Curated annotation (Swiss-Prot):
InterPro entries per record: Glcci1/FAM117
Compositional bias of kind Gly residues: 53-79
Disulfide partners: none
Span list, region Disordered: 1-214, 227-461, 551-584
Modified residues (Phosphoserine): 10, 102, 206, 215-216, 268, 340, 386, 444, 452
UniProt feature, compositional bias: Basic residues: 287-297
Domain of life: Eukaryota
Comp. bias (Pro residues): 133-142
Organism field: Mus musculus
Underlying gene: Fam117b
Protein name per Swiss-Prot or TrEMBL: Protein FAM117B
Biased composition (Low complexity): 80-90, 114-132, 204-214, 399-412
Length: 584
């Protein structure tokens, strides 16, 4: 860098180059800009480019420019700072002081030092500044320290700066040539002009962002810091504020409303707000877990639940005190913290099981209707009879024939619930069931639609026939018909099983006409590629056969097969002579 600056011919351009190095947040910095997300690169660049020049530059030659740029930010202001350094030797000391003051100064000092080498005696201090940049790297707070130099200055002492010079120099030299070319060309005419050029041209993309960042370095530094330090700081302060609030419903409700509103806005806010909310939620969940697990007794005796604890002997209030914080936590924290909430729910269930019968009596009062199932009916069912308890009782005590019909039919429920004795409904069901079985349910329309059959077939599944339809007895439909009633035509013939047509025709003479054929006379005449049976057959049956066109070979095959199968099946004793084959 320093050599190129010297070539340009003015120490101030060298300073400008140093500024360019400072600008590297601007000039080459623009190329490195995407890396700013990672703290170490930013720390290296800004520390190397900006530190001593800021302290000295602001107070020294640059005067207003350097001073303004020094506080504002390492990137844009670096250019003027370095220029001021190169002009006066005092900046060497100023640079070291600046390095002490702000970490970003260290980054600028490296660049400015290189530029100042050619121009002014400050090199001695400048090298110290150069050496400083490597150590400024460790302090990620650079961004944060830009606003407050006191935090990181310890990293940049002149002695330390001097110790590390070679690495810093190498880094600056590597980065500087890129920076130096545009910066030297643009900055060479004069230092102030070069400063403007540095900010505008090479850093245009990065320097503009740098300027924006410098204006709001506090807000920008916060996200980096929020990732590490501020969470702990905020977390430490928050629990002290909220330990008291966790004990009361009102405080929880207020916090929940605040959180709810903040979450709605957090998407548009900066990442710092989101991080704050997350940290708060974590702390609250941890407190709620800790308090619910380790401080249940304290919560039960808390002032808000004091009355309940005194009345209920700290049985009912325990679940209540845990339920109150659970609601807002689940809604505000979202799915991210479900595990902890589930843990709370499990603990509540354990508490409810431990409390026992007293808990059962008290909980329905505490919990609004619709949130809990009704208490079991075990006590009432023993003394009074209800529909729920009738099916087992009736089946056990009733007669075998009518017990299930009682439990099934609605009339049995009515009679059992209204009448104290169990025998009277049984007799009533018997009266209903017997004629119903005999007359297929004509007398009793209501019990016809029973839901379960009886093993003794006293009641069958039945349904009223639709209007205009005849009632048919079930037994007639279900009873299998005897073989003698079925006509022989429908019966399968054993001889048919062996018959397998190969022609692929759907109409088979033998299989269809076999039972109807007369015994002696069967003549198959093949004329014009068609088969016709002359005796005992109606034309309607033979039409499909005559329609099929067959080759003589297939006809012969069919005839031979037909005779072989028909003769035994129809018990034809005549030889196959009467069959005549006429080929047309």
């Amino acid at each position: 860098m320093s050599q190129r600056v010297r070539r340009n011919g003015s120490p101030t351009p060298a300073g400008a180059l140093a500024g360019g190095a400072v600008g590297p947040p601007g000039g080459p910095g623009s190329r490195l800009q995407p890396m700013r997300a990672t703290v170490p690169f930013q720390l290296k660049q800004q520390q190397q480019h900006g530190s001593p020049t800021r302290g000295g530059g602001g107070g020294g030659n640059n005067g207003g420019n350097g001073g303004a740029s020094g506080p504002s930010g390492g990137g844009g202001s670096g250019g003027p700072r370095t220029a001021s350094r190169s002009t006066s030797p005092t900046r060497g000391g100023g640079g070291s002081a600046a390095a002490r003051t702000s970490p970003t100064v260290a980054t600028q000092t490296g660049a400015s030092v290189t530029s100042t080498r050619g121009t002014s005696p400050t090199r001695g201090t400048a090298p110290g500044a150069r050496s400083s940049p490597p150590r400024p790297q460790p302090p990620p707070p650079l961004l944060g320290t830009v606003s407050s130099p006191s935090s990181s200055p310890t990293h940049l002492w002149p002695s330390e700066v001097i110790a590390a010079p070679p690495s810093a120099r190498v880094r600056h030299r590597r980065r500087s040539p890129e920076q130096g070319r545009p910066s030297a060309e643009k900055r060479s005419p004069s230092a102030p002009v070069c400063k403007a050029g540095d900010k505008t041209h090479p850093p245009s993309s990065s320097s503009s962002s740098i300027i924006r960042r410098t204006s709001s370095l506090d807000t920008l530094a916060a996200p980096y810091l929020a990732g590490h330090w501020p969470r702990d700081i905020r977390g430490q302060a928050a629990p002290c504020m909220r330990d008291k609030a966790t004990q009361t419903e009102s405080a929880w409700a207020e916090e929940y409303e605040k959180k709810k509103g903040s979450h709605k806005r957090s998407s548009s806010w900066g990442s710092t707000e989101q991080l704050k909310e997350i940290a708060k939620l974590r702390q609250q969940l941890q407190r709620s877990k800790h308090s619910s697990r380790h401080h249940r007794d304290k919560e039960r005796q808390s002032p808000f639940h004091g009355n309940h604890a005194a009345i209920n002997q700290s049985q009912a209030p325990a679940p209540k005190s845990t339920l109150v914080p659970a609601g807002p936590i689940t809604k505000s924290s979202g799915s991210r913290f479900r595990n902890s909430v589930e843990g709370l729910n499990q603990e509540i269930e354990i508490i409810i099981k431990e409390t026992g019968e007293k808990e059962e009596q008290l909980i329905p009062q505490d919990i609004p209707d619709g949130h809990r199932a009704p208490p079991p009916l075990a006590q009432r069912s023993s003394s009074t009879r209800s529909i729920d308890t009738q099916t087992p009782g009736g089946a056990d005590k009733g007669s075998n024939n009518s017990s299930r019909s009682q439990s099934v039919s609605p009339t049995s429920f009515l009679t059992i619930s209204n009448e104290g004795s169990e025998e009277s409904p049984c007799s009533a069901d018997d009266l209903l069931a017997d004629p119903r079985d005999k007359e297929n349910g004509n007398n009793s329309p209501l019990p016809k639609y029973a839901t379960s059959p009886k093993p003794n077939n006293s009641y069958m599944f039945k349904r009223e026939p639709p209007e205009g339809c005849e009632r048919v007895k079930v037994f007639e439909e279900c009873s299998p018909k005897q073989l003698h009633e079925i006509p022989a035509f429908y019966c399968p013939d054993k001889n048919k099983v062996n018959f397998i047509p190969k022609s692929g025709s759907a109409f088979c003479l033998v299989s269809i006409l076999k039972p109807l054929l007369p015994t002696p006379d069967l003549t198959l005449k093949g004329s014009g590629h068609s088969l016709t049976v002359t005796t005992g057959m109606t034309t309607t049956l033979l039409q499909p056969i005559s329609m099929a066109s067959l080759s003589t070979n297939t006809e012969q095959e069919r005839v031979s097969r037909g005779t072989s199968t028909v003769l035994p099946s129809a018990s034809l004793h005549a030889p196959p002579e009467p069959i005549e084959e006429a080929e047309g």
